[in-house]
Amino acid sequence: MAASSSSTGLPPQHQVFINFRGEDLRLGFVSHLVEALENDNIKVFIDNYADKGEPLETLLTKIHDSKIALAIFSGKYTESTWCLRELAMIKDCVEKGKLVAIPIFYKVDPSTVRGVRGQFGDAFRDLEERDVIKKKEWKQALKWIPGLIGITVHDKSPESEILNEIVKEVKKVLKKVSLEGSQKVVSVDPSQSIDTLSSVGGEKDKTFGIKQRLKELEEKLDLVKYKGTRVIGVVGMPGIGKTTLVKELYKTWQGKFSRYALIDQIRGKSNNFRLECLPTLLLEKLLPELNNPQLDSIEEPYKTHKGLLRERKVLVVLDDVSRREQIYALLGKYDLHSKHEWIKDGSRIIIATNDISSLKGLVHDTYVVRQLNHRDGLQLFRYHAFHYDQATPPKVDFMKLSDEFVHYARGHPLALKILGRELYEKNMKHWETKLIILAQSPTTYIGEVVQVSYDELSLAQKDAFLDIACFRSQDVDYVESLLVSSDPGSAEAIKALKNKFLIDTCDGRVEMHDLLYRFSRELDLKASTQGGSKQRRLWVRQDIINVQQKTMGAANVRGIFLDLSEVKVETSLDREHFKNMRNLRYLKLYNSHCPHECLTNNKINMPDGLELPLKEVRCLHWLKFPLEELPNDFDPINLVDLKLPYSEIERLWDGVKDTPVLKWVDLNHSSKLCSLSGLSKAQNLQRLNLEGCTSLESLRDVNLTSLKTLTLSNCSNFKEFPLIPENLKALYLDGTSISQLPDNVGNLKRLVLLNMKDCKVLETIPTCVSELKTLQKLVLSGCSKLKEFPEINKSSLKILLLDGTSIKTMPQLPSVQYLCLSRNDHLIYLPAGINQVSQLTRLDLKYCTKLTYVPELPPTLQYLDAHGCSSLKNVAKPLARIMSTVQNHYTFNFTNCGNLEQAAKEEITSYAQRKCQLLSDARKHYNEGSEALFSTCFPGCEVPSWFGHEAVGSLLQRKLLPHWHDKRLSGIALCAVVSFPDSQDQLSCFSVTCTFKIKAEDKSWVPFTCPVGIWTREGNKKDRIESDHVFIAYISSPHSIRCLEEKNSDKCNFSEASLEFTVTSDTSGIGVFKVLKCGLSLVYENDKNKNSSLEAKYDVPVEVSFQEPEHGIMEEERYINKRRSDDRRPKKKRKTKRDDIMIISTVTQTCVPSVNARIEDKVTG
């Protein structure tokens, strides 16, 4: 009932011991297995080979005589105490390195065996054996042996394939034992089980996404770049594929070294042996010529063999390291500043671990194994779910479900592999059911992999892990504040969890992989159902009700998280519901379906009021809290975060209470709130959100000394703001009734954002606003009575929004990057000095209906929107100076500027032409793609004359001259004249695109799509395009054209091109708009030999006289023959003019001073 293997030199009686239970198995599967093994000359022992009358105890000695034990777990296995005694003996032999155990799960789930659950567990608990010690020993064996790599036999598994697989693995072990003389085998960490044997066949697992990972890892180990010894750590979350990667590297790099060693499963081996035994494993592999090598000491294990070891460079891979001590045991104590005494320079050492902190100071670099991308994840999943390799794809329905499983796994290789195997040969119904189950909890085996890492955590780290799962994707500072307020040691616990890749921080937020999150929820669910003293976090409505009904211990409840969107029936809370929850730290009633939590239909009732004696609570969130104030017995002494949105609250509590650690208060849209006196002692309050509190008139008796963010948006009765907290960074006064800012507003030395949008009675801005040296964003949109804005000569102001104001002149704003002056009926002109605003990149002039002239604009400007400037007639010449550029996109929009004079239109097209050429010369700075690098539009009905190809209608077809796509082609300029019908009064957006097709040498068409223009209506206001408009865009030479360059660079052939322009909107689709005319220009880089160091010339050669089809090919052939004839003539220096080529007039660029100032601060609104 267990098995072992031996070399050919072992006693001939048997090599394999089979441990099993049940006569049905003996007569069926086991008899077939014995036959298959013996057919391959493998000696087998099962109990029916024993001599009649022989004591059963002597059977245990057969285990010692074996080299392989096959433990066959079936549903009836635990009915036999004898099977369990054998299993305990097998475990003992394996731990001593005398036996290899291969578990076989015969029509029983491995997790059922490991967890001793279901009928399997019931039979074990019903055993007559009363010896508690023995039962404990057997249970350990039941958990331990199934943790080894094994084989699963399903109901539908082909028996012949399974038998072949078992025989193959047995022969593999026997061969290894024969070569090595002895085999030391220890328990296999479940996290290593990504290499578990297939349950349906013996084909070797395929790896997907490994090539890129391997390449990136090899770069850190480069033998040429790094001459000395190099130690690299490979880190990542459990099951992410570290073992797969380092084993692939080991296999690939073995040939680069004469000595190499892979020590895997170090976590398991160090758990079962003393650390001092680990160096022997390494020494045996690096010096195989030594017979039974001896170690010197724990501190210097390789001292005696140092000379031999230093003769050769070595490759050493240490996999599944869990502690720093394991590294010291294998490599000796060292640091990067001192050389290894026994390792020759040029060696390479790779250490794979879940815990990056164990590598601190021991590695030169680390490689973080990330999740698989969707493509590789899908391939890995399909390979195991369907057993195909791209040749015979599965049915469409399964393909769709495959995407959902891959999305669930989020690129986690182990999850993809296990899920694929579980779903192999299952029907559609099973797949759909499995997906529903996974939404509640992870698949069992994946949970067990994570459990290994979780079990190694300290108690504080476990609490932190489970708490963080409740607040994942929240701000790091917020999560740390909550946890540290409960336990000061939580800061270190959070750091440890990050080092072990159980959590991550990204963009200032704490993140947790979905699989880890579901694992944490599963742990909480188990704690709730199993009872005991474990602290619990309740997520399910019924669990919360059970606390009320005293069927669950209230004292152990650590958190309540109730999603009100899932509460479908009216639920009443007893007055004393929270009375005994003395350890409750988090109480959160929220709505996951509405991010603003405004649509909730509250079904939680408190008919008799509420007692809330929660002294330990750190976080109190209660959406639509129904009472006028928090109960008198509520003690906020430890409260960190208070959130009561859309509540009925009128004041927080009666009187004043100590709130020494309160940092965040959110009472948004509590329309009855009129007093905040309860916050007079909140000296650490950092953020206060009172948006929509329409009954609030002032902030009297509120401690604002530490406040950083204050939100009073849409507090329509709020009229005065006398208090100026000096630490304030963001102040939202939009929609209030404030008529002026206090004179001491200049004291806000740290203010970054000030929002006063729609303050309809605000008339002036005090001059002291210029003293706000840190202010980066000022919003005055919709302040219709505001007529003047003070000069700001020295400021960090980056964004100024003055749309909807009555300002008549623009102030001096040297540092502004984004200026919005739209919807201003009083602005007649812009100051001539605007071209000196050296950092301005975005200027919004929409609907400035009195504006008549646009002066020269700064060369840094990337975006100009003058839509609806109905009085605009002229623009400066030049519209803006052209300067050397970096990778940016430029848009100049003059839609609905119906009074633009012809000279203004010509200057806009001239600027577009010059900009296209400049972008052409700088094309090396741009990524290849189909996005327009420059676009403009204006009222008109003609294609500009510099477009060499022009056609009436939306379709342009031409033959392009030979070598048109040579190396100097950098991009294409496109033009479309579009007519808009009068019926488009409700137009909200539209886009103009061009489908460009080129006929390749094989006569196939190579298409690509180019954007030409796009327009979007502002807000929900009605709008329309009033006349025909010209759209121009420049697109960098697409990848498909670059490919033509490479293939046909030396061929003198004509090309055919077809361009079709279309206009689509959000409501109409294609067909309502009409493209009247269209055009194309090919834009080439300048010949650098023509340019001097002082000026840049912009030559745009464009073939314009391409023949229409009715002229045939004769004139084109004549052109080629003439060109060939000219090439044979002696070259003379002369200026030629050909009818079929037009050179766009050369424009000399005047020197423009470079902008030295760099934008360093980023403002988020």
Curated annotation (Swiss-Prot):
Pfam family, one: WHD_ROQ1
Domain notes: The TIR domain is a signaling domain involved in cell death induction. It is involved in heterodimerization of RPS4B with RRS1B, but other domains also contribute to the interaction.
GO molecular function: ADP binding; ATP binding; NAD+ nucleosidase activity, cyclic ADP-ribose generating
Keywords: ATP-binding, Hydrolase, Leucine-rich repeat, NAD, Nucleotide-binding, Nucleus, Plant defense, Repeat
Function: Disease resistance (R) protein that specifically recognizes the AvrRps4 type III effector avirulence protein from P.syringae. Heterodimerization with RRS1B is required to form a functional complex to recognize AvrRps4 and to mediate the hypersensitive response.
Highest taxon listed in the record's lineage: Eukaryota
Record's GO cellular component terms: nucleus
UniProt similarity note: Belongs to the disease resistance TIR-NB-LRR family.
Enzyme class: hydrolase
EC number: 3.2.2.6
Catalytic activity: NAD(+) + H2O = ADP-D-ribose + nicotinamide + H(+)
Keyword Translocase: no
InterPro entries assigned: Apaf_helical (IPR042197), C-JID (IPR045344), Disease_R_plants (IPR044974), Leu-rich_rpt_3 (IPR011713), LRR_dom_sf (IPR032675), NB-ARC (IPR002182), P-loop_NTPase (IPR027417), TIR_dom (IPR000157)
Protein name: Disease resistance protein RPS4B
Taxonomic source organism: Arabidopsis thaliana
Location in or out of the cell: Nucleus
Boundaries of every NB-ARC domain copy: 211-474
Record domain TIR: where: 12-174
Active site annotation, chain numbering: 86
Biological processes per GO annotation: defense response to bacterium; innate immune response-activating signaling pathway
LRR repeat placement: 592-613, 614-635, 636-659, 684-703, 704-725, 726-748, 772-794, 795-818, 819-836, 837-863
Gene3D superfamilies according to UniProt: Helical domain of apoptotic protease-activating factors, P-loop containing nucleotide triphosphate hydrolases, Ribonuclease Inhibitor, Toll/interleukin-1 receptor homology (TIR) domain
Lineage: Eukaryota, Viridiplantae, Streptophyta, Embryophyta, Tracheophyta
Subunit comment: Interacts with RRS1B. RPS4B-RRS1B heterodimer interacts with the bacterial effectors AvrRps4 and PopP2.
